[in-house]
UniProtKB/Swiss-Prot annotation:
Coiled-coil residue spans: none
Reactions performed catalytically: L-seryl-[protein] + ATP = O-phospho-L-seryl-[protein] + ADP + H(+); L-threonyl-[protein] + ATP = O-phospho-L-threonyl-[protein] + ADP + H(+)
List of residues binding ATP: I38, G39, R40, G41, A42, Y43, G44, I45, V46, K61
GO terms for biological process, alphabetical: intracellular signal transduction
Modified residues (Phosphothreonine): T191
Biological classification of the source: Eukaryota, Viridiplantae, Streptophyta, Embryophyta, Tracheophyta
Record's protein name: Mitogen-activated protein kinase 4
């Protein structure tokens, strides 16, 4: 549980109070009352909390020493810029970013999100039965949120069960946008720093420079397969093993299937893999609805140009009980996420401060400069 403590050195900052959770100090705005820690990751700790002003339950994520690693600081900045613009019921809402006391020297960032109960990874590994209706509804919401992102020109690039938050009503929301990019920035980023390996599309594993929205569709296919089978479909141990597992299931690729590979070494590697007829998805998921298998087959296609799009997936017969085209408006404007990858820490800190101001119009310039 959260325990209230005295401020460090007995010197508290106005408008803040202090709690410890899991040996971590939280310095948070007095309107938030923490309840208990609910998650821990490489970034820091998440706790549930109540906003006293609105009586709403929220999740507070503390990112410790955010500027110690410049790449991680850029990820955080990118997520803040993106979430300020996104408004969709299947995308997590960022409700607040707490203003630090010192503009030029703050080290930690506190993000306030809507509170969800669990994530899809926890549900999949639990003993809770998942019916066809559950799988269908989770997939529908994931596709719906993704269609909104793609309509804004955003690739998520890190979809996996742990980044899909779920509540007790089975509502699903996509989170963790630190690796998201706009669709018009081709070949500019390290491919290796994209998508957890098990959910990574073949074109990323093969180091192809030109990738697009279809990388997210592949990840959705892997997540859907995991929902159906309660275990990862391609749990590769490293990059080449990952490709091998994919080919083992999909079967040996024809010349036409590998035409898109612009890396000669990668193309050669695929050709050296021993012949395999593949494994029918119907035998891997014998309990699955036939239409679910049909849609899964269309998502897990090796050649990205032949892979189903998000809109086509929503229009697939498996989704027809849930999909209403008129209820899926696109994002209002494409979002510009262009951030100079070479920014220094001081500039990243200043840009984060500017993002925070959007949530705090009451903060007057000139205070705590």
């Amino acid at each position: 549980m959260a325990m209230m403590v005295d401020p460090p050195n007995g010197m508290g900052n106005q408008g803040k109070h202090y709690y410890t959770m899991w040996q971590t100090l939280f310095e948070i705005d007095t309107k938030y009352v923490p309840i208990k820690p609910i998650g821990r990751g490489a970034y820091g700790i998440v706790c549930s909390s109540i906003n006293r002003a609105t009586n709403e339950k929220v999740a507070i994520k503390k990112i410790n020493n955010v500027f110690d690693n410049r790449v991680d600081a850029l990820r955080t900045l990118r997520e803040l810029k993106l979430l300020r613009h996104l408004r969709h019921e299947n995308v997590i809402a960022l409700k607040d970013i707490m203003m630090p006391v010192h503009r030029r020297s703050f080290k930690d960032v506190y993000l306030v999100y809507e509170l969800m109960d669990t994530d899809l990874h926890q549900i999949i590994k639990s003993s809770q039965p998942l019916s066809n209706d559950h799988c269908q509804y989770f997939l529908f919401q994931l596709l719906r949120g993704l269609k909104y992102l793609h309509s804004a020109g955003i690739l998520h690039r890190d979809l996996k069960p742990g980044n899909l938050l779920v509540n007790a009503n089975c509502d699903l929301k996509i989170c963790d946008f630190g690796l998201a990019r706009t669709n018009n920035t081709k070949g500019q980023f390290m491919t290796e720093y994209v998508v957890t390996r098990w959910y990574r599309a073949p074109e990323l594993l093969l180091c192809c420079d030109n990738y697009g929205t279809s990388i997210d569709v592949w990840s959705v296919g892997c997540i859907f397969a995991e929902l159906l089978g309660r275990k990862p479909i391609f749990p590769g141990t490293e990059c080449l093993n990952q490709l091998k597992l994919i080919v083992n299931v999909l079967g040996t690729m024809s010349e036409a299937d590998i035409e898109f590979i612009d890396n000669p070494k990668a193309r050669k590697y695929i050709k050296t893999l021993p012949y395999t007829p593949g494994i029918p998805l119907t035998s891997m998921y014998p309990q699955a609805h036939p239409l679910a298998i049909d849609l899964l087959q269309k998502m897990l296609v090796f050649d990205p140009s032949k892979r189903i799009s998000v809109t086509e997936a929503l229009e697939h017969p498996y989704m027809s009980p849930l999909y209403d085209p008129s209820a899926n408006p696109p994002a209002q404007v494409p979002i510009d996420l262009d951030i100079d990858e070479n920014l220094g820490v001081d500039m990243i800190r200043e840009m984060m401060w500017q993002e925070m101001l959007h949530y705090h119009p009451e903060v007057v310039a000139g205070v705590n400069m």
